[in-house]
Amino acid sequence: MDVRCINWFESHGENRFLYLKSRCRNGETVFIRFPHYFYYVVTDEIYQSLAPPPFNARPMGKMRTIDIDETISYNLDIKDRKCSVADMWLIEEPKKRNIQNATMDEFLNISWFYISNGISPDGCYSLDDQYLTKINNGCYHCGDPRNCFAKEIPRFDIPRSYLFLDIECHFDKKFPSVFINPISHTSYCYIDLSGKRLLFTLINEEMLTEQEIQEAVDRGCLRIQSLMEMDYERELVLCSEIVLLQIAKQLLELTFDYIVTFNGHNFDLRYITNRLELLTGEKIIFRSPDKKEAVHLCIYERNQSSHKGVGGMANTTFHVNNNNGTIFFDLYSFIQKSEKLDSYKLDSISKNAFSCMGKVLNRGVREMTFIGDDTTDAKGKAAVFAKVLTTGNYVTVDDIICKVIHKDIWENGFKVVLSCPTLTNDTYKLSFGKDDVDLAQMYKDYNLNIALDMARYCIHDACLCQYLWEYYGVETKTDAGASTYVLPQSMVFEYKASTVIKGPLLKLLLETKTILVRSETKQKFPYEGGKVFAPKQKMFSNNVLIFDYNSLYPNVCIFGNLSPETLVGVVVSSNRLEEEINNQLLLQKYPPPRYITVHCEPRLPNLISEIAIFDRSIEGTIPRLLRTFLAERARYKKMLKQATSSTEKAIYDSMQYTYKIIANSVYGLMGFRNSALYSYASAKSCTSIGRRMILYLESVLNGAELSNGMLRFANPLSNPFYMDDRDINPIVKTSLPIDYRFRFRSVYGDTDSVFTEIDSQDVDKSIEIAKELERLINSRVLFNNFKIEFEAVYKNLIMQSKKKYTTMKYSASSNSKSVPERINKGTSETRRDVSKFHKNMIKIYKTRLSEMLSEGRMNSNQVCIDILRSLETDLRSEFDSRSSPLELFMLSRMHHLNYKSADNPNMYLVTEYNKNNPETIELGERYYFAYICPANVPWTKKLVNIKTYETIIDRSFKLGSDQRIFYEVYFKRLTSEIVNLLDNKVLCISFFERMFGSRPTFYEA
């Protein structure tokens, strides 16, 4: 029997079992049950002394045990690391057992199962039937997995089954209550093993009149009275809420491969199961494949107060306890962990994922027609957009949300007519968000037409789950994660990096016959992070070349062989004499390149020097682990370059990014005290070497010159750690034209990247030169495994401060005719605590600054005068006209209790609001507020006690005739940011004092 593993899961009853859900070549699903064991590693001496004897034991052969406690010394008399070799045994017990002096107890039992039996969690195997005992149709017991799964075979494709769902609930306040608010709609996207896709929505008929129900039937809806009458081929079905819930129960109890929701673990599934129990007393029940254990659907929470989220709220995750092999997958939780976005609402995520450049085909009266295909955007983007458009009801054109009037869709493109104001450009960016509807108002005016409209919105949200599933390549990532982390598919995204790293670490330790032990308590000290340079100026009219180190920290660990067992010791000094003696003797006793000595900042205030010494002769555990991850990343990057469609590119890009993150997380885990990889000296040495590498690159580029086909680097090309046999001559021949004459200046750097200004505004030449620079740096400047990559040309760069800048980005693969991407790194445009007015204005002024830099007709003083003069005109005009709507000035904040002071004004504001309003603001909820003052208050220069002007803005709020927006608060914040973009501090201070009666705060460089 040939099978492919698709999921592993446990039953937690009186008799614990491990189950495999697998699929045969013919699409048949087969479950295999295994005994569940707890695993212990002991020496032969302990094994022989155990009473009673172990349930099962396997010899592991001779293994080397290394004590990885850090040795701290004030001189070079460092004792050798304790190391011993002994015969070891792996013990399997069906129940937990207290065994003294067992080692390797930090690893997961499931990882031991896979590795000890030679099984890959996502592998394909030809099973030996003699080791299988049939339990029932489709379920077998296996007591000897090692022999049963001995024959691994090449991977083969199998079909998968899915259920994507969404619900809508009636509510009369801000959030539905399971006790009083019925479910109005449930929508499903059902894909079976044959690939057949069914879309259907159940509508609660109890919220409609009998006349409306009859009209719905006349319009083609199916009306059913019981579960037995359900026809899944029909798109719209009317039924009572009880029948609606019974159908949900039936579907959720089926053994799909995946049941996918968006925030369903926290809301949809919880609401369905609670509502079902409330109305019928029934529960959703899952049964194990052997039919011997039944569990009720239950959502349980994990609260990790050690991982605080925004506003001090504990990081809470939600999990479904099922035992039937289905993976309940919450896209909301997954995207939060894997993507860094401004917002994790479904509309924001969809807008980020599904966009396409569309060409204007026709302009009508308040409507426009767009066409999209492979000629209007990158290959595949229009096809993905068209797929989402099949259920989409609204399309966003730039920032304008437009209703779909008509749509034509074909294989690789679309034509769509939108209700839209007349726009003048020929092409626009079209994107998808969640349908732009006011559900509260729709329920208030609820009737048949609204119910049918909501059905369309609900099924679109269910389908969005499918589209996002495919966009993020979740299935590919799940299988790759299971293989890489040595974890079940259902657990790949459950754990943090400190846990997922344990599987590959255990595998490596067993391959190298190594056991790492500690006898001392782990100590935690602070240490310096990556190097961030201060920006050398604010605005750049010349182009800036961006060079990034490839996986800097992982490659630092590989270069220095940084690992707890390769650390020879740490030499510290408390006075200058000690330091001088140690420095003189150090290189004699520990000569490079076998050893590397890393100067770090002292761990304690009474020390003046600290040097870590690593042995590079035998590759350590951490470098070996990193090589595996980097090799996988390189494989997916190669596949990314060869991919032809945007979908393939998105999946391979996300896969290489996954391996990048896990490789980079190893550095973080070295400094995390609860990690199996914890090594304070290694983590500290990693950042120290990283800082020296970025300083080295900056030193050779800052002041470099190109002329007559020769590049003269600014300094000799000397290895900053030890002398080697490389040519250090800074003059290098290039393949560039001999008439090129350019100078280079390093203007900024951040951890693993260097920003280098070239005295040119020509994008094509800048890219050409940067690519040659990349080649020369990698071949002549850098050494060992260090490499850099030319990332982009930044045009019209505006540096606000460290880690804050705005620019137009031309990627390495583009040219001067390409459309540049606007980048806002760490600026107000990307923050949620900034008003739309502020964002709009700062965007206008940054664009204006960018244009001034491009034209190059003004010096920095003239630019400053022009910008400040224009800003004053705009602010005075807005203050006098008061024409902008209140929504442009609204801010949002999360309500929480994590305040140092009990009488915090934010807490007082919400408490007073809740006293006087039926729709109270709950903990963890975001609320909107604005600064409001009396209408007769003149322009206020000196702003005091501005917290007292905060007013919560809800749906019922209307700005009274005796009130106005307290514009000065917003103007001052906007002006503070703009003056930080300008170079002339004297003019900025004078302007700010005249407008607001105080000096501005300038960002620290």
UniProtKB/Swiss-Prot annotation:
The recorded induction information for this protein reads:
Expressed in the early phase of the viral replicative cycle.
Q: Which UniProt keywords apply?
A: DNA recombination, DNA replication, DNA-binding, DNA-directed DNA polymerase, Early protein, Hydrolase, Multifunctional enzyme, Nucleotidyltransferase, Transferase, Viral DNA replication
Looking up InterPro entries in the UniProt record yields: DNA-dir_DNA_pol_B (IPR006172), DNA-dir_DNA_pol_B_CS (IPR017964), DNA-dir_DNA_pol_B_exonuc (IPR006133), DNA-dir_DNA_pol_B_multi_dom (IPR006134), DNA-dir_DNA_pol_B_vir_insert (IPR013617), DNA/RNA_pol_sf (IPR043502), DNA_pol_palm_dom_sf (IPR023211), DNA_pol_type-B (IPR050240)
Oxidoreductase listed as a keyword: no
Which Gene Ontology terms describe the biological processes this protein takes part in? DNA recombination; DNA replication; viral DNA genome replication
Q: Which reaction does it catalyse?
A: DNA(n) + a 2'-deoxyribonucleoside 5'-triphosphate = DNA(n+1) + diphosphate
Q: What is its EC number?
A: 2.7.7.7, 3.1.11.-
Gene3D superfamilies the record matches: Helix hairpin bin, Palm domain of DNA polymerase, Ribonuclease H-like superfamily/Ribonuclease H
Asked whether the keyword Transferase is assigned, the reply is yes
Which Gene Ontology molecular function entries are recorded, alphabetically? DNA binding; DNA-directed DNA polymerase activity; hydrolase activity; nucleotide binding
Chain's role: Catalyzes DNA synthesis. Acquires processivity by associating with a heterodimeric processivity factor comprised of the viral OPG148 and OPG116 proteins, thereby forming the DNA polymerase holoenzyme. Displays 3'- to 5' exonuclease activity. Might participate in viral DNA recombination. Does not perform OPG116/D4synthesis across an abasic site.
Concerning its family, UniProt says: Belongs to the DNA polymerase type-B family.
Subunit and interaction comment: Interacts with OPG148. Component of the Uracil-DNA glycosylase(UDG)-OPG148-polymerase complex; OPG148 and OPG116/UDG form a heterodimeric processivity factor that associates with OPG071 to form the processive polymerase holoenzyme.
This chain belongs to the protein called DNA polymerase
Source organism per entry reads Variola virus
Q: What is the lineage of its organism?
A: Viruses, Varidnaviria, Bamfordvirae, Nucleocytoviricota, Pokkesviricetes
